[in-house]
């Protein structure tokens, strides 16, 4: 960041030497008062933006770490997929066994009638 030459206080306390046929001191003071207000406003805005920048950079670092952790986790993903497939196969076999027995019983009962 560029170094500032003046602070609002420096501008406020600046004394000009009066010269013959120079500028009206009241006009100069009025103008400098407005410059001071603008300068203070810019300083506050700059500080707020710096704080926001720091907060956002910290958030980016945090999210980058989360992505890095997520990138290492997929190695455990196939294990859970295999486990899910195993569960689905077992469930299918169980359904075939239970519902197949019921179908056999229903067919036997229909032949008896």
From Swiss-Prot:
Tell me, what is an example of a GO biological process annotation in this record? regulation of cell shape
Q: Which InterPro entries match?
A: Cell_cycle_GpsB (IPR011229), DivIVA_domain (IPR019933), DivIVA_fam (IPR007793)
State the protein's name: Cell cycle protein GpsB
Q: Which residues form a coiled coil?
A: 32-71
Q: Which locations, inside or outside the cell, does it occupy?
A: Cytoplasm
What does the UniProt function comment say about this protein? Divisome component that associates with the complex late in its assembly, after the Z-ring is formed, and is dependent on DivIC and PBP2B for its recruitment to the divisome. Together with EzrA, is a key component of the system that regulates PBP1 localization during cell cycle progression. Its main role could be the removal of PBP1 from the cell pole after pole maturation is completed. Also contributes to the recruitment of PBP1 to the division complex. Not essential for septum formation.
One Pfam annotation reads DivIVA
Cite the entry's keywords alphabetically.
Cell cycle, Cell division, Cell shape, Coiled coil, Cytoplasm
Quaternary assembly: Forms polymers through the coiled coil domains. Interacts with PBP1, MreC and EzrA.
Name the gene.
gpsB
GO cellular component terms listed in the entry, alphabetical order: cytoplasm
Per the UniProt entry, what species is this protein from, by scientific name? Lactiplantibacillus plantarum (strain ATCC BAA-793 / NCIMB 8826 / WCFS1) (Lactobacillus plantarum)
* Main location group: cytoplasm
Q: What is the lineage of its organism?
A: Bacteria, Bacillati, Bacillota, Bacilli, Lactobacillales
| UniProt keyword Coiled coil, yes or no | yes
């Amino acid at each position: 960041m560029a170094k500032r030459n003046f602070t609002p206080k420096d501008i406020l306390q600046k004394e000009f030497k009066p010269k013959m046929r120079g500028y009206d001191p009241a006009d100069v003071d009025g103008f400098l008062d407005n410059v001071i207000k603008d300068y203070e406003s810019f300083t506050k805005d700059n500080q707020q933006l710096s704080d926001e920048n720091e907060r956002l950079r910290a958030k980016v670092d945090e999210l980058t770490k989360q992505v890095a952790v997520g990138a290492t986790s997929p190695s455990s993903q196939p294990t859970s997929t295999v486990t899910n497939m195993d569960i689905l196969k077992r469930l299918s076999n169980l359904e075939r066994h239970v519902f197949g027995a019921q179908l056999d019983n229903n067919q036997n009962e229909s032949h008896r009638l």
